[in-house]
Amino acid sequence: MAGSTKDIDALIELMARLPGLGPRSARRAVLHLIRKRALLLTPLADLMGQVAATARECLNCGNVGTSDICDICTDERRATGELCVVEDVADLWAMERSGVFKGRYHVLGGTLSALDGVGPDELRIPRLADRVTAEAISEVILALNATIDGQTTAHYIADQLGGRVRLTSLAQGVPIGGELDYLDDGTISAAMRARKEL
């Protein structure tokens, strides 16, 4: 790029590695940050340094925060006996945004995958079993993605925890506002199997 420096090029390359950003979007973002240096770039750089120094994984559930035990795990009001199991932190944050779940979470850190060589010990499944006992959990809600690996993981967890705790999973099927014509066969099939009385 004409007139650029190595530092700016390096920043663009790093930004382009972020999910959802390619080289063009990264260039636009960096240019915008430079133009708004006092308003955006400097505070962003300061906060990124602070987060880099303080961010850590919750030792209990796997959420991301700035202390060893996250705010959700330390909130006594959330000790409802319900534990929502999710694949990753982004899923936990999505559940929190919805505001429908008021219990605690357990982040697996992925799903079982024979192709990728991911077994139970690479995930937080053993810790999940420990928490069910230690925290007197009455229900484990499996909020895993409706993929082959997600369902394989759900079945494995069900085998490991079966009989010790009530196990439920999120309903699957037609989304609100969804039209059957636009849905894939698997979604329609899941919706038919999960149908309920009116």
Curated annotation (Swiss-Prot):
GO terms classed as biological process: DNA recombination; DNA repair
One function term, GO molecular function aspect: zinc ion binding
Keyword field: DNA damage, DNA recombination, DNA repair, Metal-binding, Zinc, Zinc-finger
NCBIfam families assigned to the protein according to its UniProt record, in alphabetical order: recR
Family: Belongs to the RecR family.
Function: May play a role in DNA repair. It seems to be involved in an RecBC-independent recombinational process of DNA repair. It may act with RecF and RecO.
Protein name, as recorded: Recombination protein RecR
Gene name in the database record: recR
